[in-house]
Amino acid sequence: KRGFLDVIKHVGKAALSVVSHLINEGEH
């Protein structure tokens, strides 16, 4: 199950990066 949690963390970080990118694109 630890591997599963690692996947969740990885996906979460990726999602955060995408959201931040979209927000930055929207502001400019």
Curated annotation (Swiss-Prot):
The keyword Secreted applies. Its main location: secreted. Expressed by the skin glands. Keywords: Amidation, Amphibian defense peptide, Antimicrobial, Cleavage on pair of basic residues, Secreted. One of its GO terms (biological process) is defense response. Coiled coil: none annotated. GO terms for cellular component: extracellular region. The modification Glutamic acid 1-amide is found at E25. It is found in: Secreted. The keyword Chloroplast does not apply. It comes from the Eukaryota. Residues 27-28 form a propeptide. Has antimicrobial activity. Belongs to the frog skin active peptide (FSAP) family. Cruzioseptin subfamily. This is Cruzioseptin-4.
